[in-house]
């Protein structure tokens, strides 16, 4: 990244360039770019925007599920037997970014109805100023689920905008089909995702039985 900066400065020596490791992929840093653009339109200078992004990058959440575990098994992250049984009974691992930018499982929910309910409740407890936000929903071949997730989010939070996008191939090849996740700005992500794991466990109790 520093090399790229140096090359640009050779041709445009007066350019202001800031390097930020977003610790996010695809829709995550796409959302950061949207917010940065909005801040510039509000009159904030590039230094202020860059500092805000650096200071707040661990407030960008990824909340969603994987419902096809076969690809996870192929990547060696789960045994084939567990992947088969999990998919068969409708187990949906719930993922979130940790403080290092790695997608980490924070809970496992059974069935779409429960998963939708817990995900929307999770967003409610972690998002900030939902009505002022643009929320991005990313998917790999689960557009029907993404549309339902969008409907539930719009009904609950009335955000400024909800966008649905496909995960591009570079990331999708490492994820496989079955991903559906919302990206938004919220409370700081906790160390080791301990608070987020506890939150999913607590919320899931409301829908058991």
Regions from the language model: what does each represent?
Residues 1-18, 24-34, 38-209:
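Mixed-charge interfacial surface used for oligomerization/domain docking
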């Amino acid at each position: 990244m520093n090399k790229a900066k140096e090359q640009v400065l050779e041709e445009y020596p007066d350019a202001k360039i800031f390097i930020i490791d977003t610790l996010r992929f695809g829709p995550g840093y796409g959302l950061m770019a949207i917010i940065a653009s909005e801040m510039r339109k509000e009159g904030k200078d590039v230094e202020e925007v860059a500092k805000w992004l650096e200071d707040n990058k661990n407030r960008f959440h990824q909340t969603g599920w994987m419902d096809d575990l076969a690809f996870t098994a192929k990547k060696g992250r789960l045994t084939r037997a567990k992947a088969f049984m999990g998919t068969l009974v409708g187990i949906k691992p719930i993922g979130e970014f940790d403080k290092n930018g790695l997608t980490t499982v924070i809970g496992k929910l059974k069935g779409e109805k429960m998963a939708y309910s817990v995900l929307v409740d999770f967003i409610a407890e972690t998002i900030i100023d939902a009505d002022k936000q643009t929320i991005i929903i990313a998917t790999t071949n689960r557009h029907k689920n993404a549309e339902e997730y969008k409907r539930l989010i719009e009904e609950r939070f009335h955000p400024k905008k909800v966008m649905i996008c496909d995960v591009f191939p570079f990331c999708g090849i490492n994820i496989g089909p079955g991903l559906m996740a919302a990206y938004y700005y919220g409370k700081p992500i906790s160390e080791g995702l301990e608070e987020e794991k506890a939150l999913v466990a607590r919320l899931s109790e409301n829908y058991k039985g």
